[in-house]
């Protein structure tokens, strides 16, 4: 997966605050609208793990899925398919555009693709929310698409619903140049941008510095307030996608 794809944990779903409760019928209607090509849907059960939801089984675009819709707000928490896709008729580049358009049309706002992986005929893409050009890694959405026909066959929006809200972010205490100086002489910076990353207890505004040692590429996260190195990850690119370790 991409950086911070595990996200943060908690019980306050910030993206749902202020939203009204929905009925089971309203949740089903929201799920139909979300996928748009639902040929069959049935209610499974109510659940409270990790949040109060209505669970459904459905078939959309010829793919069977299980899905959950939040009782508060009627938002899709997840939709998962066990489809076995072996045929590949579309490229990753084509599907990156498809997935971004899918999210935009469903009201997720400014999102940016960070990393993706391919397993057989299924492409999984991580998108992070963006606020004023700053990446919000806690507000992550994963989208799965069939490379056979471009259908969206999976969504994991739990991190997004848990964390997404406008932030009041402090101005960095360090400049980009000062942050780059913290990564050490063995690495050469390629690109720098501000990002919010999850921590054990909260979040931190960091400079995300993409850097290389001449052979490998790394992501170094320098705390924009203290200058401390928060994270160091290696970027791996191959035929399966772009991942971090």
Which residues are covered by each model-predicted region?
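Long, terminal "pre-/pro-" and other extracytoplasmic accessory regions
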Residues: 1-245
């Amino acid at each position: 997966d991409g950086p911070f794809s595990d996200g943060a944990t908690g019980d306050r779903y910030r993206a749902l605050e202020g939203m009204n409760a929905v009925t089971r019928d309203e949740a089903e209607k929201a799920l139909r609208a979300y996928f748009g090509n639902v040929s069959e849907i049935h209610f499974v059960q109510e659940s409270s793990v990790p949040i109060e939801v209505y669970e459904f089984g459905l078939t959309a675009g010829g793919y069977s899925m299980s899905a959950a819709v939040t009782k508060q707000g009627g938002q899709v928490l997840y939709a998962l398919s066990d489809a076995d896709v072996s045929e590949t008729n579309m490229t990753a580049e084509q599907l990156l555009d498809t997935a971004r358009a899918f999210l935009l049309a469903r009201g997720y706002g400014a999102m940016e693709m960070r990393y993706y992986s391919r397993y057989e005929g299924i492409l999984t893409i991580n998108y992070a929310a963006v606020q004023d050009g700053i990446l919000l890694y806690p507000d992550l959405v994963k989208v799965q698409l069939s490379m056979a026909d471009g259908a969206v066959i999976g969504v994991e929006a739990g991190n997004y619903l848990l964390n997404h809200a406008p932030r009041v972010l402090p101005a960095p205490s360090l400049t980009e140049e000062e942050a780059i100086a913290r990564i050490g002489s063995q690495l050469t910076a390629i690109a720098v941008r501000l990002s919010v990353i999850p921590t054990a207890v909260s979040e931190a505004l960091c400079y995300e510095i993409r850097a290389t040692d001449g052979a490998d590429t790394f992501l170094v996260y320098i705390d924009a307030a203290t200058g401390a190195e928060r994270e160091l990850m290696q970027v791996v690119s191959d035929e399966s996608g772009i991942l971090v370790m």
